[in-house]
Amino acid sequence: RLVWDRHTGTLTGRPGAQRLAVTSGGTIPDRGLFGVFLASDTGKQPRRVGELDEEMVYESRVGDVFVLGASSWRIEDITPDRVLVTPAPGQPGKLPFWHGDTPGRPAELGRAIGAAVRKLSAAGEREAAAKLEQAGLDELAARNLIRYLAEQRAATGYVPDDRTLVVERFRDELGDWRVVLHSPYGDRVHAPWALAIAARLRERYGGMDVQALHTDDGIIIRVPDSDEPPPTGIALLDPDDVGDLITQEVGASALFASRFRECASRALLLPRRNPGQRTPLWQQRQRSAQLLEVASQYPAFPIVLETVREVLRDVFDVPALTALLRDIASRKVRVVEVETQTPSPFGKSLLF
């Protein structure tokens, strides 16, 4: 909305820029939910089943089955503002999710938590209890925490900390392989790491539906329909290539599409048609998708670059992940692998 004269070094507003800034300005993004309605209803007002987060709708396709409430539903159609479904009783489906603005644990805090766990694990029971009581825990809480760490060490032989990451492999109740990476470094590091690991596994297994979940305390990978255990070294990625791999994977994700819409809105590329009146979210999504389709042909388009920066540095913490992978490559942080019959105590807390 500005003209930059590189010869004179001046910026001037284009015609209508002032009105556009007044009517469409603001930095708080519009976010919303897709309504879920029964597709079989023929009345004027179809019955409403519930709501889904827009990112989940972006990741869903016609024919997918999901669970809402106590029932399973099959997607029959996805329109710009709603999802039409039919009942799918007895069929397993994926669980819906709703994203909030809760930032994950910073890598610096995760490193400090890992260091504290390492010192507690190395100390004797009395010394550890004294340290925990000095930190404000009562006797019962300190005893429970010490027992929790001891049970994890008994199950896997290791307790994950800032210098030791544990990769645990086991079969779930369906016979599928589960891989749990225990790490204290936080969700902003684990989210892009999980994305990269899943991409590598899909390449290895020929496009198999590898599911990767992430939390502040680790990563859970599910590898279905495989008799062989997942390969060793699953978490060992090249720190020089991981940034490009994550950028490639993020570019086609629902997260990138939603963040692009927010960046384009802040840049006044999705102006409101009527001052003082919000544009319906489905119209914003539609216009944003059209803009992204054109902008994706120009990798240096400023809004594309800003969206990439926001995803890789604000939502994720790719620099911290790269630094961690370099520490692993230089043996400053070790990765140990164990195979268990059932999930360890730490693994159970991640799975359930």
Label the model's feature ranges.
Residues 79-96:
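Short, solvent-exposed secondary-structure boundary/capping segments
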Residues 71-78:
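Short beta-strand-centered aromatic/proline hotspots
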Residues 1, 68-69:
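Short amphipathic alpha-helical interaction segments
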Residues 48-60:
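Short alpha-helix capping/helix-loop boundary micro-motifs
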